[in-house]
Swiss-Prot record:
GO terms classed as biological process: translation
Gene, per the UniProt record: rpmB
Species of origin: Coprothermobacter proteolyticus (strain ATCC 35245 / DSM 5265 / OCM 4 / BT)
Protein name: Large ribosomal subunit protein bL28
InterPro entries, per the entry: Bacterial_rp_bL28 (IPR050096), Ribosomal_bL28 (IPR026569), Ribosomal_bL28/bL31-like_sf (IPR034704), Ribosomal_bL28_bact-type (IPR001383), Ribosomal_bL28_sf (IPR037147)
Organism domain of life: Bacteria
Any Gene Ontology CC annotation: ribosome
Keywords for this protein: Ribonucleoprotein, Ribosomal protein
Family from the record: Belongs to the bacterial ribosomal protein bL28 family.
One Pfam family it belongs to: Ribosomal_L28
GO molecular function, one term: structural constituent of ribosome
Amino acid sequence: MARVCSVCGKGTTFGHNVSHSNRRTNRRWVANLKRVHGRFPDGKVRTAYVCVKCLKAGKVEIL
């Protein structure tokens, strides 16, 4: 699984955890994806991974 939203393309982003002493360690933020069976903006019905932001916005009709 590529951890990318099938609708908007949102994926993993990288950054740092910053402690009080300003030490920086690598970390990543992963998109909140759900496996959804539904009708997508292109009109096709399929199962795919969609971020919760797209689900809340109604970009996918859940079947």
